[in-house]
């Protein structure tokens, strides 16, 4: 399913004023939008804006008109919203180009599988699309409309995998004092 999301993002990001490159780290997409007077050879300062676009292995159970059309796949956790916001930004910014520099819109796959960003970086994301700063896009339903939360440095969630071995003697919930942990 990441390939279908990537194809949709690449097709919708390709518009006058934007150059979309797909297959960054296999299924990642980057759309570069050059401000007025800027080009690939004269990019100026560059800012990256990143949104996740992976569907999760979840079956959506509801009757909404916007229910997933792919059984067993759902753009949960706001991923569809993040993708839509970045695509809308691409449309507006490519049309106006009323800024100085370059915007690299980064559509990251496989956030939940812990491999999308790593694959894009290993494929030369920042060598191919240099960024002076990168902002991660994530919805925040508790924040008032029209507001942004910005913090310097790493701020979004990270996942790690660890193996833990616990040695002891199991017990029963009715007699926890007999367990050893």
Where are these regions (language model features)?
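Histidine/acidic-residue-rich, glycine-tolerant segments that coordinate divalent metal ions
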Residues: 56-58, 64-74, 81, 99-181
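Acidic/His- and Gly-rich active-site-bordering loop/insert found
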Residues: 1-75, 84-87, 91-99
